[in-house]
């Protein structure tokens, strides 16, 4: 008869990789064409000038410039990219 009880294995101890959502470029930051500005689920942030919405609701830049956030009503924020005139 065993003096100590054998330890059992556990089926826990795993976790899924986080989705890395959120704002990637903040207001006033420079972006180039194709830069991801926001990764999101749903559409809390809406695309504005020079910004397009990807199929997974990601917002990305269509032009080189600076990111501008503009509040619309209470829930939604419009994201614009203002092109750099002097380069």
UniProtKB/Swiss-Prot annotation:
Presence of keyword Plastid: yes
Family, per entry: Belongs to the bacterial ribosomal protein bL27 family.
Organism for this UniProt entry: Gracilaria tenuistipitata var. liui (Red alga)
Disordered: annotated segments: 1-20
One Pfam assignment: Ribosomal_L27
Coiled-coil positions: none
Gene Ontology CC, one term: ribonucleoprotein complex
SUPFAM superfamilies listed in its UniProt record: Ribosomal L27 protein-like
InterPro entries from the UniProt entry: Ribosomal_bL27, Ribosomal_bL27_CS
Keyword Lipid metabolism: no
Keywords, sorted A to Z: Chloroplast, Plastid, Ribonucleoprotein, Ribosomal protein
Listed name of the protein: Large ribosomal subunit protein bL27c
Localization (cell): Plastid, Chloroplast
Listed GO biological process terms: translation
MF term (GO), any: structural constituent of ribosome
């Amino acid at each position: 008869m065993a003096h100590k009880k054998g330890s059992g294995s556990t089926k826990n101890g795993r976790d899924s990789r986080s989705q890395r959502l959120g704002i990637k470029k903040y207001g006033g930051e420079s972006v180039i064409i194709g830069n991801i500005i926001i990764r999101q689920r749903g559409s809390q942030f809406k695309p504005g000038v020079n910004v397009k919405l990807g199929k997974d609701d990601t917002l990305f830049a269509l032009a080189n410039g600076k990111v501008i956030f503009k509040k619309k009503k209470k829930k939604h924020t419009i994201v614009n990219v203002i092109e750099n005139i002097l380069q």
